[in-house]
Amino acid sequence: MARYRKKPVEIEAVQWTEDVSMRTLIDFTNGLVKLNDVDRDFHVYDRLHDTWVRFEYGDWIIKGVQGEFYPCRDDVFAATYEAVTD
């Protein structure tokens, strides 16, 4: 069986925590958000797949290379990504 390595690709991401303002989340997702304060549900509309994607508190919201959004748990994000310094 052949083995593959993920290409190094820079992504944009923001973590949904109490330190991040709703304005930051709205701006990052181009206003494609729904938030339910009671359940702490947060959804971002993914135009590429024409669906609402659910995020849990503490998840990273990743904007993919085609503008799609997907969630990533904090532990997985830490093991997979590192900050880009220019």
Placement of each model-derived feature along the sequence:
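Short, compact, well-ordered microdomains
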Residues: 50-86
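N-terminal non-globular leader segments, chiefly Sec-dependent signal peptides
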Residues: 1-49
